[in-house]
């Protein structure tokens, strides 16, 4: 059997009449008690009976209200959490239901279109993983921590006198990175002072600004760092560390690369002067 559709005005009218009848029958008890007690000679007893009847009526109404609230909440808990009321029985209006279906399909299409960004998303401070977004440039390794990389470069130069694995000078403890760098290139006429100051400013901004390093600033910092190394190799011979032996296989390979770069630089200078 199909469900009977009752008009809204009929349901509201029936509910109003039912509530009025309930209130009328509920008021009969206190009115009758007050009338009977008023005919009795004892005033204290009359007052106690009236107050008791009023309290009993109040407790009854409160219990009914809380009971209805608890029943309503228990019924609401039976509804599935992921249930979306868009069926024909939930939305009898065909036009509204069709519009909702259309918007849901549109949202599904938008979610598919926006699942992959048009451009590579690079958050400040860290290079993205290799598998996210689309294949971008391979200039930097995945998950590279920009600030940690800058700190390692500065600490190696400050305490070991090594700039990008090229042994350059005897470090002087107690000097800042900027002072150490200015002292190193003070006698080098090939170094552009503006680029040196830009390099130092970038370093101090990256280390002490308190904000994550952007990819552009980090790349510019590395470009200037490589440029300073090339300038220093034009006038300073790359020597081995004071110990005379590399500390590891990595240091040995680094010194070999430094000598290769230095020899190439000398060849380029001789060719240009010829």
Curated annotation (Swiss-Prot):
Keywords: Membrane, Transmembrane, Transmembrane helix. It is a multi-pass membrane protein. InterPro entries: DLT1. Residues 1-13, 65-274 are cytoplasmic. One of its GO terms (cellular component) is membrane. It comes from the Eukaryota. The keyword Transmembrane applies. The chain crosses the membrane at residues 14-34, 44-64. Required for growth under high-pressure and low-temperature conditions. Belongs to the DLT1 family. This is Defect at low temperature protein 1. It comes from Eremothecium gossypii (strain ATCC 10895 / CBS 109.51 / FGSC 9923 / NRRL Y-1056). The gene is DLT1.
């Amino acid at each position: 059997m199909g469900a009977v559709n009752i008009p809204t005005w009929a349901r509201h009218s029936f509910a109003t009449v039912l509530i009025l009848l309930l209130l009328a029958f509920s008021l009969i008890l206190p009115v009758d008690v007050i009338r009977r007690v008023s005919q009795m000679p004892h005033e204290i007893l009359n007052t106690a009976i009236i107050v008791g009847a009023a309290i009993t009526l109040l407790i009854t109404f409160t219990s009914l209200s809380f009971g209805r609230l608890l029943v309503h909440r228990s019924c609401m808990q039976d509804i599935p959490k992921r249930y979306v009321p868009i069926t024909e029985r939930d939305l009898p209006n065909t036009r509204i239901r069709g519009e909702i279906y259309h918007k849901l399909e549109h949202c599904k299409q938008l979610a598919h279109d926006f699942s992959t960004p048009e451009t590579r998303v690079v958050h400040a401070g860290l290079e993205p993983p290799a598998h996210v977004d689309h294949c971008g440039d391979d200039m930097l390794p995945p998950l590279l921590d920009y600030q940690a990389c800058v700190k390692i470069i500065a600490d190696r130069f400050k305490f070991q006198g090594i700039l990008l694995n090229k042994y350059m000078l005897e470090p002087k403890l107690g000097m800042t990175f900027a002072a150490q760098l200015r002292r190193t290139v003070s006698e080098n006429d090939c170094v552009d002072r503006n680029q040196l100051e830009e390099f130092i400013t970038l370093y101090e901004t990256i280390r002490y600004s308190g904000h994550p390093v952007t990819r552009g600033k980090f790349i510019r910092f590395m470009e200037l760092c490589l440029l300073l190394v090339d300038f220093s190799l034009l006038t300073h011979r790359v020597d081995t560390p004071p110990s005379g032996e590399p500390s590891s296989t990595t240091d040995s390979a680094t010194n070999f690369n430094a000598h290769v770069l230095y020899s190439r630089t000398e060849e380029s200078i001789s060719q240009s002067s010829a």
